[in-house]
Each structure stands twice: as C-alpha cells, then as structure tokens.
Amino acid sequence: MLYQQISQNKQRTVVLLVVFFALLALIGASAGYLLLDNYAMGLVLALVIGVIYATSMIFQSTSLVMSMNNAREVTEKEAPGFFHIVEDMAMVAQIPMPRVFIIEDPSLNAFATGSSPQNAAVAATTGLLEVMNREELEGVIGHEISHIRNYDIRISTIAVALASAVTVISSIGGRMLWYGGGSRRQRDDGDDDVLRIITLLLSLLSLLLAPLVASLIQLAISRQREYLADASSVELTRNPQGMINALEKLQLSQPMKHPVDDASAALYINEPRKKRSFSSLFSTHPPIEERIERLKNM
C-alpha cells in the first residue's frame, strides 16, 4: 500500500506537469493568434519565457530563501539532537547531509529548500523542536528529507514559474488588445469569417481563464508532493505512527509570527499562515485530516 501511494502520487504529478505545459502552450498560441495572427510564434515565445523563468528560479540561492524566512544556520554543537536526526534521515535516504537551520518561532513547522540534494537545507522552528518527541521529529524531518530526495523543491519551483509565466503572458496579451493591439488581418476581414470570430472568442477566453487554471494546477502539484513526502517519510522511518502523531500536533499549531510569502508558504510541512476558509482547491497544503487518514490506510 505504501509503495502504491508513492507511485500514484508521482504519476499524478507527471500528469499535472504535462497539463501545465499544455496550458502554457495554449496561452502562447492564443496570444500569438490575437496579437500576431501567428499561432506558432506565440507558442514558441511562451515556452521560451516559461523555461527561462523556471531556470532562473531553480537556481535561487538557498541562503536567500533561508534569510527570507528568518532562519539561522546552526552547527552540531548548537543543536545536537536536531542535527543528528537530520544526519540520520539523510543517511537512510542516501543523500548528502543538508545544511541545518533554526527559526526562532513558537509555532510548529519545518521546511526544506534547495534545487538538488547537493545544495539543500532543512529548517525547523524552535516550537517544533521543543514540543515534539524524537519519533515525531523523525517523521517531520523524514518528510523534509523526502522533499529533497524527490526533487520536490525543483518541481514546485517549475510549477510556480510556469504559473507566473502564464499570468504574465495573459496580462501582456490582454493589455495589448485593450490598447488597440491585434493583427491587422483580424481587424480588416475578421467580422465576415465565422470561424475566425469563434477562434477569436476562444482565444480571448483562454487569456482570461488561464491564470486561474494555472494557479489551480500549481496548487494541486504542491498538495500531491505533500502526500508523497508523507508516504516517503514513512518509507524512511518505518514508523507511520510517528508521522501521524506529528501531524496531529501540527494540526493544533498557531500561525507563524513573521510574514510568509506565497512561494515560501508552499515549502512548509504545515500551512504557516492563518487558515483560510475557502475551498481546499486554493490551498498549498492538503487538509491534515486527509493526510492522517492516508497514513492510517497504508
């Protein structure tokens, strides 16, 4: 059951990424048709923009991400218990030892970052380290180490970059149309061509809806990677109850004291901001109750 869950989560992520690239291609083709009367040029430009933006975000400095989240790097001497758990989990996962950081915050939370296992880092709040016992900490750190081993940070970064690229292209296309853009051929003879009018309307609709759809796909990818990391943590620790107990404590945690931006929020094991009342479709994290239920069904 455990390996089946891991396999299913990986397959769902692949499907979502394929749909994401298809959406980026669609929005590029739509913008190309509306502005240049050339599908292919718009499609190629959209994919190039998406790849460049994703590449630049992937190689964002680990130290910068930690600084944005008020995390301080610690040594084995400063936090021996935390350091040794990270070391043990990294050894089991067969990845290099990540850098270790602590966030001075009473809430219960942790996250990992880094584009690859070779430049990764793990951070935990002081509240988490004080409240959780060793088995629960192993579950949480196993979750974060799994993110590193599974290249989740890179996948999530690509998803954020693609969503941003879709929004930018859609915004530029919409503004150019609003201020009189569009191909001359569309303005000259489009009114008499029913097919062209239908295509024009569909292209406009895609420009309007694409940013929302892109955000939903990006959030869905984030939620799938959380499920995968939960299951992968159990694979590392061989202790599902430790992870379940940790999630039950996380469920009672208060929001973090310092502001957390959207990109950073998706990295944490638990939503670090005040819980929102709207649909889980718009959440970076799946409901903790559902995560616990999946672990119990392994």
Curated annotation (Swiss-Prot):
Record-level GO BP terms: proteolysis
Alphabetical UniProt keywords: Cell membrane, Hydrolase, Membrane, Metal-binding, Metalloprotease, Protease, Transmembrane, Transmembrane helix, Zinc
EC class: hydrolase
TM regions (residue ranges): 14-34, 39-59, 158-178, 197-217
Main subcellular location of this protein, as a coarse class: membrane
HAMAP family with a match to the protein in the record: Pept_M48_protease_HtpX (MF_00188)
Similarity remark: Belongs to the peptidase M48B family.
Protein's name according to its UniProt entry: Protease HtpX homolog
